[in-house]
Amino acid sequence: MAEVACQTVGWRFATVEDREVITAMVADAAEQASLRLTPPELATSPAKFRRPDGTSVFRPKHSTVFSSDSLLAAEDHLLQRARTATGPTIDLTTVGTITSKADSEGRVLGPDQAAALASVAVPGRVVDVLVGPAGAGKTAAMNAPRRAWETEHGAGSVVGLAPSAVAAQVLADDLRIATENTAKWWTTHQHTGVTFKAGQLVIIDEASLAETLSLNRITLAAEEAGTKVLLVGDYAQLPSVDAGGAFSLLIHDRHDAPELVDVHRFTHAWEKTASLELRHGRTPVIDTYLAQDRIHDGDAEAVTAAAYTAWRHDRQQGLSLI
């Protein structure tokens, strides 16, 4: 209903009632054309346990899940590509060299980053994944396959994509590769025919934010070109605003999906552990943040003022800030 209301907000109706009727009709038509994934209620709840609209109070409101033939087909295609080992690979000797040597900034790969490189570079999956929690050295982990690919396939053999222009620019700055946002790349591909090259590695950052149909289209183009796609992200972070979930689907389809586990961002050891606990939704970690005086309360005005004061102080000190 919310999506229908959004799509019809510019339409004019004689009365509010007319708008509500049309909204309901469009929503009903969309429901009829969709595939219902949530099973129906097999038992009727007593009247005192039913809402005014007749639904059971034992089932959350608006919790029915729908899909479509095209979306399910896209998921199947992505799973198949993730199980297909016909993509370009890197020699194990090159992987060993990259693992043992520091990069241009003097960074040496940690054990989890080195394992991730071997998992991504050697098997030859057409679509591969890398899970990188916040602060776990994702940039260094992505830089490793870039170095390996350019060693064997030459300059320009690694390109980047991301669901947003901002994320694409960050990826370009971090890895020093050509990048584009996924929507722009697909539009250019449709109008000009420009596509990937055989042997390339395509890194799609913030992959949990990418919609499933978009990933399916891009990975199909990559498969046809003889290119490997590496999806990098964190399934525990924000999902796509469109029909998404493909990244999480691919992660949980494997028992050996590479995941970075060593958090580098924080100075204090307790905060490294706590950030991962919070990521997994383990509520007891809130006590840790309370004990470390990291949780403060107040009304909206007081909290806003405190945040601004802290921001201004850090800025005056020349510190990095949001």
Regions found by a protein language model. Name each.
Residues 128-172, 229-232, 260, 294-297, ...:
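Conserved RecA-like ASCE P-loop NTPase motor core of nucleic-acid helicases/translocases
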Residues 151-221, 249-252, 261-297:
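Conserved P-loop NTPase motor core of helicases/translocases
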Residues 77, 86, 115-116, 232-322:
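Conserved helicase motor core of P-loop NTPases
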Residues 123-124, 155, 196-198, 223-226, ...:
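Short loop/turn elements that form and flank the Walker-type P-loop nucleotide-binding site
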Residues 134, 206-210, 235-236:
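Conserved Walker B
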Residues 222-231, 235:
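Substrate-engagement module of ASCE P-loop NTPases
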Residues 1-126, 131-136, 140-152, 165, ...:
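Beta->alpha loop/short-helix hinge microenvironment recognizer with preference
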